[in-house]
Amino acid sequence: MLIKTLENLVTEGRNKNTLQIDKEDTLGIIELINNEDKTVAYAVEEQKESIAKAVNIIVDRMKQGGRLFYIGAGTSGRIGILDATECPPTYGVDFELVQAIIAGGNQAIFKAIEGAEDDKELGKQDIIDRGVTSKDVICGIAASGRTPYVIGAMEYAKELGCAVLSITMNPNSEMSKKADLPINIIVGAEVIMGSTRMKSGTAQKMVCNMLTTASMVKMGKVYSNLMVDVKTSNEKLVERAKRIIMIATNVKYDVAEKFLEEADNSVKLAIFMIKSGLDKDSAKSILDRQEGYISEALKSIEKL
C-alpha cells in the first residue's frame, strides 16, 4: 500500500524540532524555518563527490553533442525549469543544451496537474517527444525517489543509452537504483510534514546550480569567475558585459564599449582581443582552436 511506502520516507516524517510551530509567534516561525534551512548545505556537501562525477559525465556528453535534460513532477519539475532557463542568458548557450521536462507539460508550471506524476508511460512519451538520443544526459529529480513519471522516463532513457542521473532525498530509493549515478541528499524531515518544496526543494536547486555552473566552467564559459559568454539581450546585460570586460582587462568604460562593439557583442572575444592585442579575426581563430577557453588561448600565444 502507498501509505506504507510514505510512512517509510524520510521526507514524509515529522520533524521533532517543529512540533510546536503552530504555537510560535511570527519571528519564532521564521527562526524555526531558518534553522532547518541551515542544515541543507551540509547535507549537500555529503554528496559533493557524486555531484562532481555527475558534472564530468555531463561535460563529456556535451562535448560529444549531447544535452542535459532535467525531468520531474511538481516542485521538482519546476526546479529543473528554473535552472535550465537561466543557462542561455548567463552562458550564451543554445536553449536546447539544458532542458527541463515537467509532468503535465507547461501548464503544470503554474497549476498542479492531477495524476500526471503517477503515469510511467507519460514519462517515457515525454522523452520520446523531446527527441532524446543516446548522447544525452537525463537527470530525474524527485524528493521521494519513487515518482512513477520520472522512473518511466529514466527507464526509457537507459534503454536509449543515455547517461542517467538522479537527485533524491530518501535513501535506497527506486530512482537511485535506476540511475547510473545517484545523488542522494538526506535533508531529513521537513518543517511542515511532507512539504518537500522546502528543504528538499532548496537542496535540489543547490545541486542543479552546481551541475550546470560547474559544467559551464569546464566548457570554457567562465574566465576567472566572470560570465564571459553572457548574452547582451537587454540593457542591463549590455552594461554587465561592459563591466565584465573592464574588470577582466582593466580598461575604461569607453574602451570596453568600443571592443564589445568590434567583437559583435561577444564579451569573450572582446576580452581576448584586448589581452592579446590581436585583431578580431585572428583572435576568434585562436579562441576557436582552444574551444573558447580564454586562459588556454592566452597560453597558446605566449608559446609563439
Swiss-Prot record:
Its EC number is 4.2.1.126. The keyword Lyase applies. Pfam families: GKRP_SIS_N. It catalyses: N-acetyl-D-muramate 6-phosphate + H2O = N-acetyl-D-glucosamine 6-phosphate + (R)-lactate. GO terms for molecular function: carbohydrate derivative binding; carbon-oxygen lyase activity; ether hydrolase activity. Disulfide bonds: none annotated. Belongs to the GCKR-like family. MurNAc-6-P etherase subfamily. A lyase-type mechanism (elimination/hydration) is suggested for the cleavage of the lactyl ether bond of MurNAc 6-phosphate, with the formation of an alpha,beta-unsaturated aldehyde intermediate with (E)-stereochemistry, followed by the syn addition of water to give product. This is N-acetylmuramic acid 6-phosphate etherase. It comes from Clostridioides difficile (strain 630) (Peptoclostridium difficile). The gene is murQ.
